[in-house]
Amino acid sequence: MTTQVQPKDKTVTVNGLKLHYLDWGSEGSPVMVLLHGLRGHAHSWDDVSVAMCQDYHVLALDQRGRGDSDWAKDGDYTTSAYVSDLLGFCDALKLDKFILMGHSMGGRNSMSFAGRHPQQLEKLVIVDVGPTLDSRGSERISQEIRQVPEEFDSFEAVVEYMSKQNRFASDAVLRRRLQYSTKELPNGKIGWRYDVAIREQRRQGTVPPSEDLWPLLPNITCPTLIVRGKETDILSPEVAQKMTETIPASQLVEVERAGHMVFEDNPGDFIAALKGWLS
């Protein structure tokens, strides 16, 4: 998707960390905050941000350890840490009654935030994740992270390596994803921009236990959209259905020709479903 719309790079300091975010303008319009997934970043949402920024004040956050935000000095990448960051982000920007949309890890963080601070949200969108993960997908992602090289000879080498894990997204979308996921290292090679601690925790088996989100779901009082990629290996149909039965004002939509990276795999249908629900 090509566009002349360009976001402003901004930062805010929360919990001692400089957090970077993309401000897509339209101040005064309803606020929409976007949270990326485990290996994502604020630019993961670019197609969605461009499509929504005419009607919404879109803020796409680089969560701690990702993109241009600081790495957590203590290696704390727990749900409670992300939720605390989001709360501080909202306080710093004086956000209230906003739309929150999160994908994967960002979706779990969104559910936790919504279950604890329901009064702050106007609407909630959970993208391809649930309180319980399909073991096929969670093991696939953990294995990919454990096995990924720490450095590559060139950006093209990164694209070639990661394209083997890419099922649906276009080459242009994959390249954009990797452009903002990598950086040039002092030795001239290309490495990952997100915190090495996130990879090491998976290699060493020291990932903190996941928070049980099921007890929080009944607390989510705002209208909620659950989006599932038809070909996903992360959010099972059974868990998605249970979520709609547990979150009071919720609705489920499935996007065809999409796996776990729903809005990158099929941005057109994802955006159409999102706009349809919001209207």
Regions found by a protein language model. Give the residues of each.
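Conserved hydrolase catalytic core segment
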Residues: D96-R136
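Helix-rich cap/lid subdomain of alpha/beta-hydrolase
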Residues: T132-Y194
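Catalytic histidine-centered segment of alpha/beta-hydrolase-like enzymes
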Residues: A258-P267, I271
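Conserved serine/cysteine hydrolase catalytic core
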Residues: L185-E245, Q251
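Glycine-rich "HGGG/HGxG" loop immediately N-terminal to the catalytic nucleophile
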Residues: H43, Q63-T79, S135
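Conserved HGGG/HGGXW glycine-rich cap/lid loop of the alpha/beta-hydrolase fold
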Residues: L17-D68
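Conserved acidic catalytic loop of the alpha/beta-hydrolase fold
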Residues: A81-F98
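Alpha/beta-hydrolase fold catalytic core
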Residues: M1-M32, Q54-Y56, L95-D96, P248, ...
